[in-house]
Amino acid sequence: MKKKIITVALVLSSVCAMAQQKENRDTDGSILRGSYETNSFWSNWYIGVGGGINIYEGEFDNKTSVGNRIAPALDVALGKWITPSYGVRLQYSGLKAKGLTDASGMYAKGAHRGYYKEEFNVSNLHADFMWNWSNGFLGFNEKRVWNVIPFVGFGWARSWGNSTHDNEIAANIGILNTFRLGKRLDLTLEGRQMLVKECFDGTVGG
């Protein structure tokens, strides 16, 4: 089976304002979806830093509660909006993962209800394609308070600890909910799932 890490994070982002129209409706009340002014390569970038929780899903993790699998998460992102509807980003995400394994697990330690606890470091460096649904369906509005932004991406994931490690290609899917705090500051609630091969924690099968 595939191994999964579910992440929920709050991210604070500093943004560069778009140089498009500020309203999303014309004088007749119709939604405006373009055309948009083309900016230079250095325009419409943002940086974001945040924290949250990781929940690991492996072969034996259904043998313990979700609360026992909660671990801290850290996100750092650099992104660019190519248009108000489409953007890309490079993100580091990870920190820790916790769960249960059997004796074959690379990160097995203390016994727990017939299994072994595992806790290991994890990092995921990934590139994502973002689609701003709010701007796509409702038209660009610089002052919109809430934007819904699904994304998909791929990257390189690493687990390590106990003097061992594993590297895997990771697929990522998730959704961003951004809330406007000011002209150049957003607060984002992000939910994301990372999928890797089952050997990510050294346990195969099940």
Predicted regions and their residues:
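Short loop/turn motifs that connect adjacent beta-strands in outer-membrane beta-barrel proteins
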Residues: 34-44, 85, 135-147, 181-184
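Glycine- and aromatic-enriched membrane insertion/assembly motifs of diderm outer-membrane
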Residues: 65-128, 194
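Residues on the lipid-exposed face of transmembrane beta-strands in outer-membrane beta-barrel proteins
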Residues: 49-53, 76-80, 127-133, 152-156, ...
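Residues that define the transmembrane beta-barrel architecture of outer-membrane proteins
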Residues: 43, 66-74, 121-125, 146, ...
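Transmembrane beta-strands of outer-membrane beta-barrel pores
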Residues: 51-57, 92-98, 133-135, 154-160, ...
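Residue-level detector of the transmembrane beta-barrel scaffold of outer-membrane proteins
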Residues: 46-48, 87-89, 147-151, 186-188
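Outer-membrane beta-barrel translocator domains and adjoining extracellular loop/strand segments
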Residues: 59-65, 100-109, 141-143, 161-171, ...
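Short glycine/proline- and aromatic-enriched beta-strand/turn motifs that initiate or cap beta-hairpins
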Residues: 20-79
